[in-house]
Swiss-Prot record:
GO biological process, one term: cytoplasmic translation
Protein name (database record): Large ribosomal subunit protein uL22
Organism: Maconellicoccus hirsutus
GO MF, one annotated term: structural constituent of ribosome
Region (Disordered): 160-185
The UniProt record lists the keyword Ribosomal protein: yes
Coiled coil location: none
Pfam families: Ribosomal_L22
Amino acid sequence: MGKYAKNARNPAKSCRARGSNLRVHFKNTRETAKTIKRMPLRRAIQFLKNVQDKQECVPFRRFNGGVGRCAQAKQWGTTQGRWPIKSAQFLLELLRNAESNAEFKGLDSDRLFIEHIQVNRAPCLRRRTYRAHGRINPYMSSPCHIEVILTEKQKYVGKVSHDDSQKKKVSKKKLARQKEKMMRE
């Protein structure tokens, strides 16, 4: 079992999954993972399916050189976006793996959200392409490592409001004026 970059806040209420040396572009996968971070699990799965169907785009913020503009990126507050289908497929498989790990632990999959997702570069794989005049150029691939931690949302209990405990705050000036008014009467 590999080491994770981050530990879960509550290990009893969280599950994790990881993939190493995945043959999928690092830059596209990083942008896709950044988009689904902090999303509820159901929404993230639906988003990745929509990306595969080109119904929603992945906004490109860091690795956006030469990325075209699309209207679907407006909902993310940017103009550049793409539909990295292979990255979405790999992330979808990883989320399904993490979800099955959560079910094995007895967690409620409807209350899970993506607490941590990280994409790291893996060692490049080298191939060659043949060019004119007998030259050879490198034909590199940029694989990546992905890790994800899902955590169950906690139920927050709101404070009970008491009418007698919530008194209207009055400034010193206003108190002095009220006392002065009472003295006159």
